[in-house]
Amino acid sequence: MKFQFSSPSKIFLFSSVILILIFIGIKFELLEDTNSNRNDKFNNIINRFINYNIDDSIYKNKQQQQQFSNKIYSNEKKILLKNKIIDTTIKPSININNNNNNNNKLNNNNNNNNNNNNNNNNNNNNNNNNNNNNYYNSIEYYSSFVSRLLKSNDDDGIYYDDYQSKYKKNHYIVQFKDRINDETREQLKEFLIGTDITILKEQPFKSHIVHYIPHDSFLVFMTKEQSVLLSSKEWISWIGEHEPSNKIHLNYHEKSIGYPVYIILSGSTNSLIQRWENTLNSILTSYNSKVKLTLINQKKLKSIVYCNDESPSSSSSSSCSLIGSEKIVYKWISEQSESNYIERSEKLQTANRLSPTVIFGTKDKLVNNDRIDIPLRGKGQILSIADTGLDGSHCFFSDSKYPIPFNQVNENHRKVVTYITYHDNEDYVNGHGTHVCGSAAGTPEDSSWAISSFSGLATDAKIAFYDLSSGSSEPTPPEDYSQMYKPLYDAGARVHGDSWGSVSLQGYYGGYSDDAGGIDAFLYEYPEFSILRAAGNNELFASLLAQATAKNAITVGAEQTAHVNYVSDALEYYDFSDNANFQRPCLFDKKYCNYTTAKCCSEVSNVKGLQLCCPASIKQNASDSFTTQPQFYNENNMGSFSSKGPTHDGRLKPDIVAPGEYITSARSNGENSTDQCGDGSLPNANGLMSISGTSMATPLATAATTILRQYLVDGYFPTGESVEENKLLPTGSLLKALMINNAQLLNGTYFWSASSTNPSNAIFEQINGANLIQGWGALRMNNWLYVKSSNPTPPSRWIGIGGLGKNQKATEWKEDSLSSGLNKSYCFTYKPSSSSSGSGGGGGTPRIVATLVWTDPPSYSGAKFNLVNNLDLLLLNSDDDSIITIGNSGGSLQPAGKVAQPDTLNNVEGIIINPTKAMNYKFTIAGTNVPIGPQKFSFVFHGENGQFDWADSCPQCVDGVQFPCLITNGIGIQSCGSDLLWTKCIVQSCNEGYNYNSLKNTCDKFLSYNYIIIIVAGGTMVLIILLLMWIKYQEYKESKRDSFRRFDDGTGIFVRPKDKDAKVTPPDLYNLVSPFIIELTIATACSLVATAASILQPFYIGNIVNNIPTTKSIGEFKSDFIIIFILAFIEFLFTNVGSWISGIVNEKMVMRLQNKVFRALIAQDMGFFQRNNSALLMNVLIVDTPMLRSALTGILLSIATGVCKLVGSLVFIFTISWKLSLAFFAAVPILGLVTQIQSQFTKRLTRQLLFHNSKASQHGTESLTNMHVVTNYCKQEKEMVKYSDQLMNVFITARKLIITNTFAGTGKWLLIESLTFVILYFSAYLVIQKQFTVGLMISFSLYIGYVVDASSSLFGVYVSYIQCLASATRVFMILRSAPRKRTTLEEEEADRLAGLSGGGGGGGDNGDDKKDKQNIENGKDVLPSNIITPIDNVENSNGKQDDPNNNNNNIGNLDYSEQLDGVSTVADSTVGLTKRELKKQKEKEQKEYFKQTGISVAETPTFLPSSYTELTECRGEIEFKNVSFRYPTRPDVQVLHNINMKFEAGKCYGLVGPSGSGKSTTLELISKFYPLHGETGGKIYMDGIDIAKIRPNNLRSFVTNVHQHPFLFDATIGENIGYAIDNPTQEDIIEAAKLAYAHEFINDLPKKYDTQIGEAGNLSGGQKKRIAVARAICAKRKIMLLDEITAELDPESEEAITQSIKVLTQGHTVVMVAHKVAAVRDCDKIFVLEKGYLVEEGTHDELMANKGKYYRMFSEDKDDTPLQNNNNNKNNNNNNNNNEPSSSSTPPNDQPTPPPQEQQEQKNDQPPPPPPQEQQEQQEQQQQQQQEQQQQQQQQQQQQQQQQQQQQQQQQQQQQQQQQQNDQPPNDYDQVPPPPPLPSESPSPPTGNNDGQPLVQMDEENDEER
C-alpha cells in the first residue's frame, strides 16, 4: 500500500511550497537590494594604501608626491567616448522621478549631495534619506514584481501596452562612485540577473554588461525600470542613456559610400532583423534605394545600402542619393535600443636568405643562416597563417608522400597540417600568401638543393593555412574573426601571423575598430594563442591598419635587412617594373602619358627623365645607390614605408619590427601544378621573388615567436639544454613580453628625402626605450636565445620571468593576477661585474630592462580610450621602498624636471635603467584600476653587463608597521611580519549588507537565505544519498557472495536469505524500510525545511542585537521580526507535517513487519515449533518487531535532521569564527569515544533485556496454560518464585542499561558544559578586544547549542542503531528461516553450481564453473565434489542424508541438544570435576547463555522446489517404501526403520502398537508435516507420485488429520467444525456433527452451535474429540488420518464413531491409530508397529491367528502365547533389507523385540522434548550398553543372515523364472520382495514416461502392479 495524500493535503502542501518559494525569492531580492556602502572610510583606506606605496622618500617634497598620487589615482568623473566627453558632475543622471513623491525627495537629496559635498552633516542626512527612499523604491518594485507574477493571461494585451516602454531594454552608461573592482562588478551582474524580467518577445535576451568605458563606467543593456532601481544604489554615481549620436562612427563621403557598415548589437534575433529591414525599405522607397541586412552573429550585423537598380555589391549610382539614404538608415538604426556601435567596413589590402641572419643577430654583428648559429627552427610547433592562398606544388611546401590536407588535419604532412578553403584552394601567380608562408616556414624536402638557402626562418615548424581570397582579389576574411582563428587553434596552432589589414577611409586613422576588438576578444578567451599583425605600408604617422590597433596582438613594423641583400638578392629577384612611374614624365610632356616601359627604356638615353618609367634604369639607379650609400641600406635602419603609430587614443604601436624590405622567398605560379623550383638550382626566378612591406616582416616575426615558443616548451630555458623539469607552457602575453624585452632599438639613420638630413632614431623616443616608429625595437634573438650545443659560452644577458624564481618549477608556472588595489613584487640583486666573461657578466654599460604585458579585455569601440584594465609597473629600491622609476616614463613625453607620468593607455609597460652600484631592486606591479578582473599578466626582465640573480626574499614592508588594507566589501588591517612581508589582511569591519566569513577572511553575502538552503538541504541530501549508495553497494557485495535473490511474500518487505548466524547488516535493515522510502523522503524533506528555518533564526537575532546601539526606533527591526516569525511558522508547519507522515509510516511499518514475521512463523514446519516455545515467539512478534520499527524510522529522521542542523550550524559558526569552532571539534573525539563505549554496553544489555523479557513471558504463558497441573500439585508458590526470578533478571538488566546510559549522558553533559564555558569566555574576550561583536557572540552561542544538539542526536543514532541490531537479531532469524520457493529454474541451477549444501546457503564454488558447465554439457555423470544435485535423496556434503527442502535438517554445526531457552549445554561430562572447575564451566555456560537469542532455527533456510506436481484429484492410494525417519530434535534416535506399507484407495487401515512405536509419526509423515531425510529416508507415494514433489498445501487439501489431542480455537462450535472449508453452510456443519455423534450434546447447550468454546465451560475430552472428528468429517477429504479418536470416548460414543467411520470409508481412505481392538477390528488391514519396525500386517482374524505381537496385545492371556519369529514372517519387511545392515536398526532374530524404555516413551506417541542433562547422560549410558549387547548379538547372527540371504536369492531366482514362464504377475504384492539395489544405485520411485503416463500401471480389476 503506497502512501497517498488526500486532496486537502495536496492543496495544503502545494500552498506551503509556493509560500516558501515566494519567501525565498523575496528574500533573495531584498538581499540583492542591500548592497555595500562605499563610504568615505573606504576611500580613505585607498588613499592611505596608495600613499604608503608611494613613499615620502620618492620626491623632494609633498607637493610632488601629491601630484603623482592624484595623477595615478584620479577620480575624475568624466565619461570618455569617441564622439563626446560627458562630465557627469554637470550633466544630470536619468530622471527617476516618475511622479513619485518619495522619488522626488531622492532627486532633491541627490542634488543636495552634489551641491554640498563639503558639508558632512548634510551628506549624512541625505544618505539617510536616500536609504529610506531606496527602501520605498524597493518595496514599490517588489510589489509590482509580485503583481506581475500573479497577473492573469487575460490581461496580456493591456500588460504589453503598459509595460512595453518600461521593460524595453536599452543601452545605459552606468558610472560607479569609486573605482570598479571584482566585487562591485559582480554586484552589478547579480543585480541585473536578479531584477531581469524578459517580457517583450522581440527581446528574448537577458540584461547584461556590454563593455567598460572610462572612467569607472559600464555600458549596460537593461530595462528602464532596472535603470531607475539601479540609480538608487549608493554605489552608483550616475546613469544616463547611451545617446544615438554616440553610436555612429561614420563619415559620409564619396570614398566610403557603398561600403558595408557593421552594426554592433547587444542581442538580436532573425525576426528582429527582418522587421528592421522591412521598416527601412519602406522608408527608402521615396529615395529609390534599399538596404540589405545580414546577421553575422547574434551581436554583429552587416548593412549595405544600394540603389534599386543595382545589386547590394554595387558602390554607387547616379539614379539615387546613397549619402542621404545612408544617413536615414544609420540614424534610424542608432535609435534602436539593440544597437550600440556603428562603423564602416574598411578596404582590405595585403600590407629570405638573409632575413634570419638579421633576426638572430645582435646589434653588433649578423650570424650565419645555418644550424650552428640558428639551431632551433620550430620543431614540434605549428604556426598558422591566413592569406591569399598557398601554392602547394611549390617545393617549399610539397610532400612526396602526402597531398595537401584540405579542410582536415593531417600532421603527417611534412609542412602543411591543414588547408582551410574559405574561398579556394590555390594562390594566384606571384601570390602574396605563398611568399608569406615561404618566409615563415617554407623549405624544400631535399635540403641539399641550392634553393634551400632561401628557406623560411622556422623550417622545422608546420603550417596551418586559412585561404582568404579567390583568384587575385584582396583578402576577404570572415566578418567574425573567431570563425577564422578557432579552426586554426583546433588544428594545434598557437602562433598566428596576418600580413593584411584594412585602411580606414573615413578619417579615423589608427582607430580601434570592431575587428580589433574581435582580435582582442579571441586572445582574451584563448590566452595561450598569439597573433602577429602587419602594421601597414602607409609610412605616415597614425597610419596603422585597423586590425593592427588591437591591444593584445603583436603589431610588426618593417626594418631594412642586411646590406648584402640589397646588392645581391634584391637586384636578382625584385621586379623593378612595379616602381615605374609614368606620372612625372606625363606632367613634363603630355606625349609621355601613353608611353610603355619598353618605350621609356628605348628613349632613356635621349631623355634622362624617362628613367622614372624604365625598369632597367630604376634597377641600375638602385644598384648604384645600394653600393655607394650602405649607411642607408642595412639592418640598423627602419623601412621608410612602414606605418607608424600611435593609435587614435595615443597607444604605442607597432610593438616590434622585423626585416621587411626586399625579402626573397617562394613564388607562386598560380593554378599550374608543376613544381616551379625545377632542380632547385640558383638563380631560380620561377621559384623565388623579392617583395617589400610589413607583410614580409610579419611572417619572419611569426616564425621567430614560434621558435621562442619551442625554446620554452622543450625546456631550453634557462640552461640552454632541453630539460624535462624546465618545460614551460607559455601564454601569448609571455611570448609578447619576451619578444619586446629582448628587442633592440635601431640606431641607424632614417631616410626622409634626398634634401633632408639623416637624423638619429633617438629623437623619436617618446618613452625610454620605445618610439612610435619602431615600437620597442627590432628582434635580436641571439642576445638571449642560448643553446648550449651550438654555443658553449653563455650569453652576457641574465633573464628572469615573473613567477619562475628560486624554488619555482617551470612545469608549474602560470601567470600571476591582480585586482584593483592589489600589487605583486619581484626582487633581484645587482652587483657590478668583476670580469668581462661569465654568466651575467660583460664589459659594457650595466643595463636593466623590464617588460610588463597583460592580455586586456576587449574595449568598446566607441570609447575614447581603449584600455580597460590598468596595471602599473614600478621599480623600487627594496631597501627603503623608494621609487626609482615607473613604467613607460622618460623620453620626449617627460620633459626635464617634470614628474614622471604614469601610463594609463598601454597594456605594455617597460622600464630601462642603468644601475651604478650594487643594490637590491624590486619591481612592483600595481593593480591601479581593474574593472574586469582579476587581470592576469606576464612580467619579464633582463640584466646585462653585471651580476644579477633573484633575491632570497622580497621585502614588502618595514618590521612592526600596521597598515589598513583593502578587502572586498569591508576594511581590514595587516601587519609587517618578521620576514618583512605583509601578513594576511584581517577583516576589521564589513560594509552594510555583508558579514564576516572567517573561512575566507572576507566580507560576503555568504550567509544569505539562499546559500543556507543550498548548503543545508543540498548537503544533507547529498549525505543521505551517499549513505543509501553505500548501503546499496554493501547489498551488491552481499549478492555477489551468494546466489539468492531477495523475495517478497506479499507484505512489500524484502529479506535476503542468509545463514542464521549471519550478522544483520545495513542492507538488511534498509530492505525493511524500502517500501516506505517515498513517505520517509517526504518526511525527511519536511524535517530539512523545518531545520533550515530554525537555523536561520539565530542569525537574525544576532543582527538585531548588533543593530540595537545604532537604532532609534523599534520599527526599524520590523523586517527582521517578520522574517523571524515567518521562519518560526515554517518550522512549526513542516515539523508537524513531518511528524504526521513519520507517525503514519511507523504504524504502517509495524503492521507490515509483524505481518512479515507472522507469515514466516506460519510457514515453518512442525519441527520448528517443537524446538521453540510459542510464548517466546509471540514475544518476538509483539515486542521485538515494534522496537525494531521504532529504531529504524527514528534513525532515518534523526540522521536527516541531525545532519541538516549540524551542517547548517557549522556553516555559520565557521563563517563567524573558525578558531572558536575548533573548540567543538576538539571535543568530537571524546564524544565519539564515550558513545562507542556506551554502544558496546548497550548492545549487550539490550540483547539480555529482550532475552529475559522473553523468558518471563514464556514462563507466565506456560504457567497459565498448564494451570490445572499447577493447581493439582499445589505449585502456585513455586511458579510465583520462578516468575519473580525472571522479573528480577529483567530488572537487573534494565538497571544496568539505565546506569550505562546515565553515566554516558552525564559525561557528555559535562563535556558540553565545559565546551560552552570555554567558547563563551573566549568569545567575550574577542568582543572586548573589538574583534567580535555582541551579536556575533550571541549567534555563535546559539549555533553552538544547535551543533551540540545535532551532534548528540547523531551520536544517539549510533546507539539506536546498536539497539536496533539487538532487536533485529531474533526477527531476522525468523525471517531468514522461513521456507520459500525459488522463483526460476535458473536460480536452482545457480544454487546447484554454487554448491549449496542441501538447498541451504553458503558458497561451495571452487572457481571452476567453466569446467563444471562443460561437464554438464558433455553429459558426464560425474560432477565435481562441490556440486550437489537438486534431486531429492542425494547425500549432503555433511555426510547425512538430509532433505534439501527441510528446515529441520541436522546441517552444519547446529547443536540440537540446546535447550529451548537458548542456553547451550556444554558437551563435556561434569563427572570428576572439582568445584572450581564446575564454577568456571558454569560461568562459561552463562556467557554462552547471553549470546543466544532463545530461538532455535536450522542453519540454513528451507528452499522449496521451483515447481511441483499439482494434483487436481486424488484416488487415495498411499505407499511407504523403505521409509526411515528421525526427528530433528532427536537425530540420534531413529523412530521408523525401513517401513514398507501400502494403503489402497477406499479402504480402512489400522495402525496398532505400543506407545512410542511410531504410529502417530507415520500419520504425520503422510501429511508431510516432516520431510524425509535423504536417500536413507525412503519414499512415500500418493497415487504413484512421490509426495516430496507435491506442494504441501496441495497434498493436504486431500488429507485430513485428527490428532490424538483435539486442538480447538476460541470461536463458536460451528466455526470450529466448519474451519476446514471456506464458507461452510449450516447443513454441512450439522451433518458432520451428526456423523461424529456430537449433534445431541451440542443441541443441549444454550446457544447450541453458536456457543463459544470458552463459554461452554470445560468440555469433556470426549466432547472435544467428537468436535474434532466432526471438523475432519466436514472437510470431506479423500484421505482421513485418525489418531486415537476413540481413546477418551465412552463405549456408546466409541461404538457410534466406529459405525460412522464405516460409513466414511465408502469412497475414502481411512488410516486409524488405536490402542483398542474395537477401533480396528473391522479394518481391511492392520499394521503392527513395535519400536519403529513393522512386525506384522493383516486382517484382525489373520493377526489373531498368527498369535504374534497383535495377538499378545489384544488377547486375554498374553504370557501363554509365544511370539512368532518375525524374520520368517513373509509380512516382515525387514527380512528383505534393502539398506546396509545396522546394529542399531536390526532387532534380534531369536527372541521377541524388547519393549521400548519407559523414559523414551511419550504419551500420545509424540517426540519428547530433550530431557535434562543428567537424564540425558543416563540415557546415553543405557543406549551405549544396548549397542554393545547388539554388537555381540550381531556377530552371532552374521553367519545366519548370510545363509538366509543366499536362500532368499535362490527363491527369488526360482520365482522370477516361474513368472517368466507363466507370463503372469504374482497374486500377492507382498509375496515377492523387490530385488536389492546395486551398491551405486538408489531405489527409484515410480515416474512418468515422456507422455506423462505412469510407468507402473494398475490393473483396475485385480488392483495389482504390472
From Swiss-Prot:
Q: Which residues cross the membrane?
A: 1011-1031, 1076-1096, 1121-1141, 1210-1230, 1309-1329, 1332-1352
- Membrane topology of this protein: Multi-pass membrane protein
Q: Which SMART domains match?
A: AAA
Bias (Basic and acidic residues) ranges: 1407-1420
Q: Which GO terms describe its cellular component?
A: membrane; plasma membrane
Primary localisation category:
membrane
Domain spans labelled ABC transmembrane type-1:
1080-1363
What keywords does the record list, in alphabetical order?
ATP-binding, Glycoprotein, Hydrolase, Membrane, Nucleotide-binding, Protease, Serine protease, Signal, Transmembrane, Transmembrane helix, Transport
Instruction: Cite a single GO MF annotation.
Output: ATPase-coupled transmembrane transporter activity
Coiled-coil regions, chain positions: none
Q: Report the gene knockout effect.
A: Null mutations in either tagB or tagC lead to a cell autonomous defect in prestalk differentiation and a 5-fold reduction in the expression of the prestalk gene ecmA. Disruption of regA in a tagB null or in a tagC null background results in higher levels of sporulation.
Low complexity: bias regions? 1765-1779, 1814-1871
> What range does the record give for the signal peptide?
1-31
Enzyme active site: D387, H432, S695
Q: Where is this chain glycosylated? A: N594, N621, N672, N747, N823, N1172, N1522, N1658
Domain ABC transporter spans what residues?
1518-1756
Q: Where is the composition biased (Gly residues)?
A: 1396-1405
What Pfam families does the entry give? ABC_membrane, ABC_tran, Peptidase_S8
The record's comment on protein family reads: In the C-terminal section; belongs to the ABC transporter superfamily. ABCB family. Multidrug resistance exporter (TC 3.A.1.201) subfamily. In the N-terminal section; belongs to the peptidase S8 family.
Q: What is this protein called?
A: Serine protease/ABC transporter B family protein tagB
